[in-house]
Amino acid sequence: MPTDVEIAQAHTLEPITDIANRAGVPSDALIPYGFTKAKIDINRIASENTGKLVLVTGISPTPAGEGKSTVLIGLSDAMRLRGHNSIVAIREPSLGPVMGIKGGAAGGGYSQIVPMEDINLHFTGDFHAITAANNTLAAMIDNHIHQGNTLGIDVRRITWQRCLDVNDRCLRKVVTGLGGKAHGVPTETGFTITAASEIMAILCLALDLTDLEARLARIVVGQTFSSEPVTVGQLNAQGALAALLRDAVNPNLVQTLGGTPALCHGGPFANIAHGCNSLIATKTALSLGDVVLTEAGFGSDLGAEKFFDIKSRVGDLNVAATVVVATVRSLKYNAGVPKDELTTENLEALASGVVNLERHVENIRAFGIEPIVALNKFASDTDAEINQLKAWAETMSVQLIPVEVWAHGGQGALELADAVAVSMQNQTSHHLYDPELGIEASLLTIAQKIYGAADVELSKQARQDLAYLQENGWDRLPVCISKTQYSFSDDPSQLGRPEGHTLHVRNLLPRIGAGFIVALTGDVMTMPGLPKKPAAENIGVENGEIKGLF
């Protein structure tokens, strides 16, 4: 079987102008970046939101991932094969994980968005623009202090960090400004990965360029010596940051291998941010297509919860149908089966691990939607394992439909497409909690209803953070919980369906520009590291073509 990149490179891409015509993008709104990718000028697209929105999420993954994006893309092609004017709205890959554990991140097999090499490596420069804006702000903060510090910024309480789109553990803790007075004030700080920057979250939640600049101005970068918050607006930096992001705010148009238009824009992580593609891209797609398929990172406990409670709240979105992607191997992994034994038939482990899928189904129902389970088939799956899961689905009164989009593209998801077409007709989603009840109430609701926890425990530092939020009137914002993707608890070793645990919150961080409060739990880090054998070792160039992107 050819690799993902070999499949993508063997495919003849349609001109992006043809894809734009298929999507209904006016010619004067198309900004080509070569022949196979483009940006869309959002000022020239009518904001009608007439399409139906379908959310694709997943179960708790194995470290290799379960093919959620692959199923999303294949399903979009299947919907088009069934006569729907479908459009995909998907996140841009982060370069760090591409070079780290994941390799390519634009789908897989015959269910990909293309040109996959461009999308994975630099694309249209959105991540670079976000990185530049983030680091320009960091430079302006340090320069303000160096030039006299009229705002009285306390260097010990600067919370803004520089960012890069890499996995580099050595940058987690650094000291800047060394070398004497001429080189600035020594400051203990660190780097985040670009996908975890608040500017990434802002870009993905802004309604337009005007809203983007207003959100940038509200970013809190630290505190003064008198414990007052310091904002970007006080530094008068929002205009420069907006200028750097002027083009990045427009969504990117590419295509699937099946010729379905795809808006690929923004890429916040779901375990350390809100995990959804840009609201601008989603709303643009809803104005163009009759069915828009989008995804939220990791499982229902992370990306999907944040989609319903953060993104949908900001954008006034209604989710008409939801698909939960599951795999046999992940269910066995959630029963404690070692990674090197996941391809061996194990009905006992499958029966034990299916409780994880059960919780994810219940989670989606908590938002008012009856989910459909898409079983992403692998060659190692046996008939006995699949039949056992079908029997389980009957006891849960949930549809479970096997799909083979990796091998067959849209043809491998036609049954799923038919089920989604029925499901999306009469469903209305809702939020899980009311932010007006306060941060602690929001945290407890999510912990109990989505994670199966009994209680939430705030550390001493988190209590101090809460008091600071309350003093500044920020304690009625939605919460964005930063948590491991491998467990419903904050302990990645607690697989399956842990119940009655305590969610430990160590920090509450104001992300006022984005419009939410980040609750840090467990040991989640905002700058990943590379694995022992990074995917970068397999990537290269032969005769001008990229090789090794899985």
UniProtKB/Swiss-Prot annotation:
The answer to whether keyword Ligase applies is yes
Which domain of life, per UniProt?
Bacteria
UniProt-listed Enzyme Commission number(s): 6.3.4.3
Protein known as: Formate--tetrahydrofolate ligase
One Gene Ontology term from the biological process aspect of the record: tetrahydrofolate interconversion
Per the record, the pathway is: One-carbon metabolism; tetrahydrofolate interconversion
Catalytic reactions on record? (6S)-5,6,7,8-tetrahydrofolate + formate + ATP = (6R)-10-formyltetrahydrofolate + ADP + phosphate
Which residues are in coiled coils?
none
Q: Which residues bind ATP?
A: 62-69
Q: Which family does it belong to?
A: Belongs to the formate--tetrahydrofolate ligase family.
UniProt keyword Nucleotide-binding present: yes
Per the record, a Pfam family? FTHFS
NCBIfam families xrefs: PRK13505.1 (NF010030)
Q: Which SUPFAM superfamilies match?
A: P-loop containing nucleoside triphosphate hydrolases (SSF52540)
A molecular function GO annotation: formate-tetrahydrofolate ligase activity
Q: Which UniProt keywords apply?
A: ATP-binding, Ligase, Nucleotide-binding, One-carbon metabolism
